[in-house]
């Protein structure tokens, strides 16, 4: 009697979870998605940015065409400072020219619709399924995982992948099992890494705004950043991030109401956006909005036995760099590649629990260095945009406008070195950036080099002033 098919239980019908489902289908792996909400396409007022590294994987899966149709590609970013200075960056156009994919923003709900509607078998997506606990077993033929839901149902598979976001239930179960195995101190350290220093009001407005589609506006204030992204069909995406009064532990992070969000936006109602348009005008045509705390975490251990977490559950970033969803899509690519290699070599029998534990640890080892680089860059960019500290103000005001093009290769390295699905053709690979910037990624923290350079320049300027006065 032949072995039953290998099966993955995916917790979370998120962008990450649905993309994983498509990838698993491509290699013939069965799956079930357990989503706690009543729908996989909720309206939460959020947009999502798809950059070339995420776009390429979606393109490999045959999904990017619908994403592209829903967006107006960014061609420029207009950046404004408190002293009235502003400049225009053509970085978004340069990214398109180099990689063949634009910086594209669309409604998060629309992307979820694209991913869900394209699934070959939607019966594998189950809603109103809140995970209560996960059990692992290595007892002969019954080896595998059991996932219990709050309604009493049990779902069996070979591995569990938590794609259930920053408030991950899967992560909690992973930590519970790790603690039971004598790793309580490691779990304590992981929990301590989770914090929040920023809040964000994000929203979607609809109607004539007077703003040009594809031209992003960013206004940088001390402790705040306002970003407005006019898109096609008179849709405007926007977000307002703000540094909180202190750094919060994840478990103590504040919650916000819609009244809090409205008050936050009212403070910047007079912020000019160009063409005699102010942020208050965009606010007046709002369709939906929300306010959340922006958690930040980069965990070091992503798996235990047959249980793995991916996406925001292990690497949550601020919104400024726009790599959150794209990094999660890369998680999917690397995991699917490893599963494809492992299952292809097994032929008749399934991998043992020991082999799967090693595979998931391998995923962690392979990907952690790159994710760390992206996370560190995102961490710094958020603080440069918020003018948080003297050196970061100097970087934003004087380095970015005049020397930003010199550092353009840094984010391009990040794109070119991205993971893709190894078993599918690479679309748009003829664009020069994929080869030009590949394998030149500076994982030592290129922006740290910029910071040190700025400090040196400031120090020399102070010494020069002192010398002239002496």
Swiss-Prot record:
Pathway named in the protein's UniProt entry: Secondary metabolite biosynthesis; terpenoid biosynthesis
Biological process (GO) annotations held by this record are: terpenoid biosynthetic process
Q: Where are the transmembrane segments?
A: 447-463
Enzyme class of the recorded protein, top EC level: oxidoreductase
Task: Provide the residues annotated with a glycan attachment (glycosylation).
Answer: 128
**Name of the molecule in the record:** FAD-dependent monooxygenase dpchE
Q: Which residues are involved in binding FAD? A: 35, 49, 108, 312, 325
């Amino acid at each position: 009697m032949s072995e039953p098919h290998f099966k993955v239980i995916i917790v979370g019908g998120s962008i990450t979870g649905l993309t994983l489902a498509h990838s698993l289908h491509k290699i013939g792996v069965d799956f079930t998605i357990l989503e706690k909400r009543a729908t996989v396409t909720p309206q939460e007022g959020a947009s999502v940015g798809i950059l070339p590294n995420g776009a390429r994987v979606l393109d490999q899966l045959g999904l990017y065409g619908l994403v592209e149709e829903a967006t107006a590609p960014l061609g420029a970013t207009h950046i404004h400072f408190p002293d009235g200075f502003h400049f225009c960056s053509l970085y978004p156009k340069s990214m398109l020219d180099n990689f063949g994919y634009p910086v594209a923003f669309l409604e998060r709900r629309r992307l979820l619709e694209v991913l869900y509607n394209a699934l070959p078998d939607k019966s594998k997506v189950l809603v109103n399924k809140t995970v209560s606990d996960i059990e692992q077993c290595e007892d002969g033929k019954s080896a595998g995982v059991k996932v219990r839901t709050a309604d009493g149902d049990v779902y069996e598979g070979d591995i569990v992948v938590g794609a259930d976001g920053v408030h991950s239930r899967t992560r909690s179960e992973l930590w519970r099992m790790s603690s039971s195995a004598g790793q309580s101190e490691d779990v304590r350290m992981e929990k301590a890494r989770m914090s929040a220093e920023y809040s964000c009001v994000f929203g979607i407005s609809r109607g004539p705004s007077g703003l040009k589609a594809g031209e992003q506006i960013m206004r940088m204030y001390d402790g705040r950043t306002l970003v407005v992204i006019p898109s096609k069909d008179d849709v405007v995406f926007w977000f307002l991030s703000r540094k909180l009064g202190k750094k919060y532990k994840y478990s103590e992070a504040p919650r916000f109401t819609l009244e809090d969000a409205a008050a936050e936006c009212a403070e910047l109602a007079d912020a000019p956006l160009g063409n005699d348009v102010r942020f208050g005008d965009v606010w007046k045509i709002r369709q939906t909005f929300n306010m959340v705390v922006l958690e930040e975490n980069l965990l070091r251990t992503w798996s235990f036995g047959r249980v793995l977490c991916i996406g925001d559950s292990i690497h949550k970033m601020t919104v400024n760099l726009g790599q959150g969803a794209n990094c999660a899509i890369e998680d999917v690519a690397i995991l699917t590649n490893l599963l494809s290699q492992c299952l292809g070599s097994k032929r008749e029998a399934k991998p043992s629990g020991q082999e799967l534990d090693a595979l998931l640890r391998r995923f962690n080892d392979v990907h952690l260095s790159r994710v760390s680089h992206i996370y560190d860059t995102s961490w710094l960019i958020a603080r440069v945009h918020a003018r948080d500290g003297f050196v970061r103000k100097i970087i934003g005001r004087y380095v970015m406008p005049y020397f930003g093009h010199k550092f353009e290769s840094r984010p391009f390295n990040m794109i070119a070195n991205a993971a893709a699905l190894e078993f599918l053709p690479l679309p748009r690979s003829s664009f020069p950036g994929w080869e030009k910037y590949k394998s030149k990624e500076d994982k030592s923290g290129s922006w740290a080099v910029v910071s040190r350079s700025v400090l040196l320049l400031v120090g020399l300027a102070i010494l020069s002033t002192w010398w002239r006065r002496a």
